[in-house]
Amino acid sequence: LGVDLAAAKPAAYRECGCGMGPALNIAASSNAYLLADRGTWLNFRNRGELAILVQGDKRMFNQYGVMVVNPARHPHVKQALAQQFADWVLSPAGQDAIASYRIGGEPVFFPNAGS
C-alpha cells in the first residue's frame, strides 16, 4: 500500500492485540486510523467520528474460501456433509445467499465462485 510500517511504527503504528470490535473502539476513542473488515464496520455502532476513507481497493481484497478436510487424514470428520455444504456454497443458491446477506441494507460479502 506504499506505507513503510517499520519506519512509521515508533510514532504512529499501534498494535492492540485484540479483536476488530475492540480495535474499532480504540480507534474511535483515540482519533486513529484503522484497517477494518466490512462486516465488523457495518455492525459497529460506536463509531464516534470514524468514517470510511477508502474502500474497494483491490490491494485490500480479503477472499474467503471453503474446502473439505481430507477424511484420510481426519477420519472423524463428516466428509459427506462437508462436501454437501461446500457444493451448496459454490452453487448459484449459495452464492445468492452470500450476496443477499446485509447489515443495515449494505452488502457484507461479494461472492465470486466461478470468477
Predicted regions and their residues:
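Exported/periplasmic ABC-transporter solute-binding proteins
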Residues: 1-115
